[in-house]
Amino acid sequence: NIELIFGISPGFVSESIDQTTLNNKIQAIFDLGIKSLCILFDDISFEATKQKGKEHAEILNKVSQDFPEIKLYIVPQIYSDQLSKTDVKDCLYLNELFSRIKYKVPFFWTGENVVSKSYDLEYISKIQERFNQELIIWDNFFASDYCEPRVTIDVYNPFVKNPKNICGVMINPTGKVNLDILLLELFSFGMGKGNEDFKSILKKHLPNEMIDILHYFKFEGRIGDVDKDIEIIDKVLWNSSMEIKIELYPYLHFLRFVLKNKPDLKYLLDKRLRLKS
C-alpha cells in the first residue's frame, strides 16, 4: 500500500505564518484527493524557542480542527538530537510543542544526528513516550541532497533488532530512479524483508567493475589505490552500458578529476564526502 503524503513548509520564508493562506493551500490539495499531509517546520532559519513551539502547536491544532478528514504528520523544527542545544527531553521548543498539541500527530525524527548511521531503539522509544506521539524515523542514510554529487551505496543495517515499537521508518532517497530502485532493495534487505543478500543486489544493478571501487560509496568511505581506482573508474565510465551509470556520472567524474589531479581538497573529501585517506 502506498500513502501519498503532501508536504507544506509554512514559515520557511517569513517568521509569521498566515493560517488563512495555509488553509487555502491545504484545501487545494485536499480537493485533488490527497488525504495525508505533513507540516514541515524543519530548516526554518528562525530560532526554535518555547514561543515557536506554542505557535507551531496552534497551527497544527487549527489544521486538525479545520480538516478532520486529513491524516496529519509533522516534522518539528528540532527533528534530531544534533539540533537541540539541550538534552532533547528537556528541549523547551519540543516540550511546548507536544504539550499543546491536542490531536494525534505522528512526528518524523532523524535520530541522534541529521544523518544517522544507526539508532538506539530504547532511546527512540523514550523520546516517543516523552512527547506522547507516534515517532517515524526519517532516515537520511542514502540521502545525497546535502552532499551532491556524493552517492552512498552501502549495507543498510541501522537496527540491532526489528524496530517494533516505533510507527515506521521512511528513507530519504536520491531522486535518481535507477539508483533509488537499488537503494530500496538494500533498505528492504536491511529491514529483514528482502530475499537477496547485499552482493546479489549489487551484481543485479551495478557494472561488475563497480564492486572494486565501492570503498568510495560506503557511508564512511575511504580513498584506495589511486592509480588502480582511476583505471576502474575509466572502465565504468567508458565501457558500461547500464542505465544506472548515467546517474552515477557526476560522482564518478568528480572522483576521477580529484584522484588524477590530486589537489589539496582534504576538507572537501573528509568533511563533505566522508572520505579519509
Residue ranges and their predicted role:
Residues 27, 31, 107, 156, ...:
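Generic preference for hydrophobic/aromatic residues in regular secondary structure cores
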Residues 191-277:
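C-terminal functional modules
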Residues 1-70:
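Substrate-binding cleft of carbohydrate-active enzyme catalytic domains
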Residues 4, 9-16, 25, 179-183, ...:
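Contiguous hydrophobic segments
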Residues 44-188:
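Catalytic-core regions of glycoside hydrolase
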